Amino acid sequence: MLSFLRLSQLGRIGVQQRFKPLIHRTLSTSCRRFSVDIAYDEIPVSRIRNFSIIAHVDHGKSTLADRLLELTGTIKKNATNKQVLDSLQVEKERGITVKAQTASLLYRYEGSDYLLNLIDTPGHVDFANEVSRSLAACDGVILLVDANEGVQAQTVANYHLARGKELVIVPVLNKIDLKNARPDAVTQELFTLFGIDPDGVLRISAKQGTGCEQVLVEIVKRLPAPDVRRGEQFRALIFDSWFDRYRGALNLVYVKDGEVRVGQEIVSCHTGKVYEVKSLAMLRPDEQKIERLVAGQVGLLGCNMRTSKESNIGDTLYLKKNKNCEPLPGFKPQQPMVFAGVYPADQSQHPYLKGAIEKLVLNDSAVTVVPDSSPALGQGWRLGFLGLLHLDVFSQRLQQEYDAEPILTAPSVTYKIKLKGIKMIAAHGGKDTIFVSNPALFPDPNSVEEYYEPYVLGTIIAPTECTGPIIGLCVERRAVQKTSINIDNDRIMTTYLMPLNEIVLDFHDQLKSISSGYASFDYEDHGYVASALVRMDVLLNGTLVDELCTVVHISKAQSHARELVLKLKELIPRQMVQIAIQATVGGKVVARETLKAYRKDVTAKLYGGDVTRRMKLLKQQAEGKKKMRAIANINVPRDTFINVLKR
């Protein structure tokens, strides 16, 4: 009879909307597990905790999230529970978190029910935008550190990011079950670098489940409840969104004030557009439909946004009936640091690729898109990314999720240029400073007062014995050492000021190679620094090829030019005319290679020793070649451009 009554109540919720939504979950304590029905929206704010797990790549964030989901009964304990929150194929293949996910956990502690909203975060530096976005909805974080590897470069970055947002930090050492684990030494590292009290550091094994229950207890005890007001007018912050082909843009929101119900009309502060709330859901981690969201909670809101441009990360939503709503403080989105051209392999695929990019950009708002065109590659786009891994993952998602096979050009960075001359400044709308990411658009050097390139402050943590080779690599990349700290007897942390252009291609690979994989690297934006830059042009028989223009530091112009002309000589097919491949800087040729023409033996038909006839034929051939060089078009196949430009 009791079960029938419950089913009857649940059946009437959608019609009458007057019964509290009931969530049937198996909860846990350290002693026992039991089942209980909870009206989640009746949980007071004082028993809500919003938190993230932040850590270096592969320190066990997703594994710990799996254990917390199991311990709270959100998912059944199963051997197949691996990276439950990592839903993207690229995440499972690479073993990294790319897209922040959310799960609402119900936990019983000392006889009271708590709602814990776990917002998973990526660990790689390229996805710091996802981390920042996640922390906007949090009141505390778990700082997870591998007890074997110790503090890494991104651990340092994530710690300072959380401290900058004044979040409560719970330090946790993971992988204490490993044979080479050194929890005491790593605890001392946390004290040395961050001043963290060793007595407050938890020790767990997320893989084995050891100590994970204590993590839940400390979340309840140490983290503060969210600072929200349920009696005020509804306001919610959009901190993530993704696209559903049937429901349009779905928004992950953090309700700061009041409450919202299905059927109510809401307004976007950013666009001013009005929407009807079509669906509300909690993520556990799969969608579980509900009828209302209240202050302090995190949930999924669908309101029939049909285009990706309508959903803006950091936007505030409020009820239409509430006039003059004050927008919530959003968070500062990161600016792209690496740019690459993206073109369809076949121009007939342009509309399809355009739609795929638009949908992915909704799901990854850190990517910037600007239409671009190339005589060699056709119509395409110039995309901005946070880093090389970000670019790789975006390209892989295009292929896996949309069956698109785009051509990606080699990555570049954005330069700042200070102009001189009244006419040049007037031509740029009266601005004496411009930003250029495409080398082909660089202004004439005579109109430039100074060039600036983006610099980053890089942090390298590596074994002490690798210090020499690492310093050599950094000096080669024009880096300047700023600080050096001995973490312990075996590892050292150094910081360098280095040009972004020198690390976007293969710096990380080289660093891993010379340190046998033990070094970790992280960087943060340091702004623009004046630099001696030059634009390098490529000429084929005196004709400028815009697609092959590059920007290099003057100290590396000669070596880069030599590499480029040799590569072109190998890739351009031989033709009926000789081709002079030249790399020039400021009109001066700095490197040249010559591609010989096909040779036709015009004397093959001769016989005997008629030397005058032989000389006549050779003279006619020479005149014909001279004429052909003057009028012939050099045919450079599209594949050649692709092989030179692609990564």
UniProtKB/Swiss-Prot annotation:
One Pfam match: LepA_C
GO molecular function: GTP binding; GTPase activity; mitochondrial ribosome binding
UniProt subcellular location: Mitochondrion inner membrane
Positions that bind GTP: 55-62, 120-124, 174-177
Single GO biological process annotation from the record: positive regulation of translation
All residue ranges annotated as the tr-type G domain in the record: 46-227
Statement: the UniProt record of this protein carries the keyword Transmembrane helix: no
EC number(s) stated in the UniProt entry for this protein: 3.6.5.-
Membrane topology: Peripheral membrane protein
Keywords associated with the record: GTP-binding, Hydrolase, Membrane, Mitochondrion, Mitochondrion inner membrane, Nucleotide-binding, Protein biosynthesis, Transit peptide
Family: Belongs to the TRAFAC class translation factor GTPase superfamily. Classic translation factor GTPase family. LepA subfamily.
Family annotation (HAMAP family): LepA (MF_00071)
Official protein name in the record: Translation factor GUF1 homolog, mitochondrial
Species assigned in the record: Culex quinquefasciatus (Southern house mosquito)
